[in-house]
Amino acid sequence: MSEVRQEYKMHSLPAVFLMEATLSDEMVNDLNEYLDDLLNQEDRVSHAGTLVGQIGNGEQLTMDHNHPKLGKFNELIQIMGADYVKNFAGSTVNPFKENRVVETDELWSVHSYAGDYNPIHDHGTKTLMGISCTCWTKVPQQILDQPTSGT
């Protein structure tokens, strides 16, 4: 698990630790190719039963985190997840004596379009230390056209 490298930032908020990263173009392209293929598959599996938002124009699909196109992405989120846990523990309780291993349990996509709504929410996890993340691979032009914060 040592070939994937990514710069990221840790944001400490009063009751939250927020991690942020910008993925490489290669990784985003691999994700988008996988997702485009997934959308075209007749046997795609809907993940909509767990949906919090109102996605009427798009879909929520189960992704195979072991798929070759997702290998680097899956490895990266596991590395970042382990680092997140390490930073959280070191800042809130006693630091761990050993690094934790993070494994991907579920991965899904939310394909949203105009009129769809997916509010900020949290996810239940199968373990006490379960974590989740969000990744945007395509951003609507009207969002990109907005002024950048702080400028």
Features from the language model and the residues they span:
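A generic structural micro-feature
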Residues: 13, 99-101, 124-129
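Catalytic core of non-heme Fe(II) oxygenases with the double-stranded beta-helix
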Residues: 106-151
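A short coil-to-beta-strand element that immediately follows conserved catalytic motifs
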Residues: 91-107
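Contiguous hydrophobic segments
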Residues: 3-4, 8, 101, 146-147
